[in-house]
Curated annotation (Swiss-Prot):
Coiled coil: none annotated. One of its GO terms (molecular function) is rRNA N-glycosylase activity. The keyword Glycoprotein applies. Glycosylated. Its EC number is 3.2.2.22. This is Ribosome-inactivating protein momorgrosvin. It is an enzyme of class 3 (hydrolase). One of its GO terms (biological process) is defense response. Transmembrane segments: none annotated. Belongs to the ribosome-inactivating protein family. Type 1 RIP subfamily. Inhibits protein synthesis in the rabbit reticulocyte lysate system. Keywords: Glycoprotein, Hydrolase, Plant defense, Protein synthesis inhibitor, Toxin.
Length: 18
């Protein structure tokens, strides 16, 4: 989550789905 956090809130949510 922390790494993907850089992309933004949307990026974090997208990673969660996967």
């Amino acid at each position: 989550d922390v790494t993907f956090s850089m992309l933004g809130a949307n990026g974090a949510t997208y990673y969660q789905f996967f």
